[in-house]
C-alpha cells in the first residue's frame, strides 16, 4: 500500500497576541485540507505567559485508523515556534540592554520636564503636601513649582500580578522652589526625593511605546523612599539609570 506523505504544519498560521508577560499563542488557521481539519489534533506545550525568546513545541496527532483509511503518513509530528518581537511590560525580571536603559533614562527626563510645565502643575500638590502636610491654608490660587536641579535618577519596578502589568516609580534627588500663593507667600526651596509614579512602562525592541504618569510626590530622601516601596512589595527591583548623554 502506498501512503501519501503530508506535512500537517505546512499551512499552519501561528498568531501571538498581547504584551509580555501576558502573551497568548493561537493557531486559528491550520489548513484547507479536509483530512487535517477533521482528523488532526494540534496541541502547543504552552500558550499563555510567554516571553520573547520562548520556543514553543506544537504537536500534531491523528489516529492510526484515520491515517490508514486516508492512506496518509505525517512527514513530521512536531514543529517549533519562537516568540519574538512582541511588546513587553517592564518588570523586575526584565533584562535591559544599553539602548533600552538609555530609552528609560530619556523617558524619565521627559516625565520630569512634563511635570514642571504650567508652573509645575503636576508637582504642586505633592510639594504642598511635603512642605505643609494637611495645612491647606497655605494653598493659594496661583501656586508654582520650579525645578532647580535633579540627579541620581533610578526606577523601582514592581512585578506584574494577575492581569495587572505592575507599575514603576521613578526616583530622583530634586531641588524644587515652591510658592504656595503668588504675592502672599515667600517661595521655599527644598531638596527631597521626587517620586514619579507611572502606571506601567511598555516597550518594544529598544523603544518605550507607552507610559502614563499617575502622580508626583516627595519623600525625605531616596533611601527612605526605596524602603517604603520595598515594604509594599519586597520583590520590587531598583534600576539605576545612566547619566544623560
Give the ranges of each region predicted by the language model.
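A short, surface-exposed beta-strand/turn
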Residues: 69-88, 180-219
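C-terminal partner/receptor-binding element of secreted or periplasmic proteins
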Residues: 218-245
Amino acid at each position: 500500500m502506498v501512503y501519501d506523505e503530508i506535512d500537517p504544519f505546512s499551512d499552519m498560521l501561528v498568531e501571538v497576541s498581547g504584551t509580555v508577560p501576558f502573551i497568548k499563542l493561537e493557531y486559528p488557521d491550520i489548513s484547507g485540507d479536509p483530512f487535517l481539519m477533521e482528523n488532526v489534533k494540534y496541541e502547543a506545550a504552552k500558550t499563555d505567559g510567554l516571553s520573547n525568546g520562548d520556543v514553543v513545541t506544537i504537536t500534531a496527532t491523528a489516529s492510526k485508523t484515520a491515517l490508514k483509511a486516508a492512506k496518509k503518513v505525517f512527514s513530521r509530528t512536531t514543529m517549533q515556534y519562537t516568540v519574538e518581537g512582541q511588546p513587553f511590560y517592564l518588570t523586575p525580571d526584565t533584562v535591559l540592554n544599553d539602548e533600552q536603559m538609555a530609552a528609560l533614562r530619556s523617558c524619565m527626563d521627559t516625565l520630569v520636564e512634563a511635570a514642571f510645565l504650567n508652573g509645575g502643575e503636576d508637582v504642586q500638590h505633592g510639594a504642598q503636601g511635603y512642605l505643609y502636610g494637611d495645612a491647606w491654608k497655605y494653598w493659594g490660587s496661583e501656586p508654582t513649582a520650579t525645578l532647580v536641579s535633579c540627579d541620581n535618577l533610578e526606577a523601582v519596578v514592581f512585578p506584574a500580578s494577575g492581569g495587572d502589568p505592575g507599575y514603576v516609580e521613578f526616583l530622583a534627588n530634586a531641588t524644587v522652589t515652591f510658592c504656595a500663593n503668588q504675592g502672599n507667600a515667600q517661595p521655599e526651596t527644598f531638596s527631597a526625593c521626587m517620586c514619579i509614579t507611572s502606571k506601567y512602562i511598555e516597550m518594544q525592541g529598544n523603544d518605550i511605546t507607552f507610559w502614563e504618569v499617575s502622580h508626583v510626590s516627595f519623600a525625605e530622601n531616596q533611601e527612605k523612599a526605596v524602603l517604603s516601596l520595598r515594604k509594599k512589595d519586597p520583590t520590587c527591583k531598583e534600576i539605576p539609570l545612566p547619566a544623560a548623554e
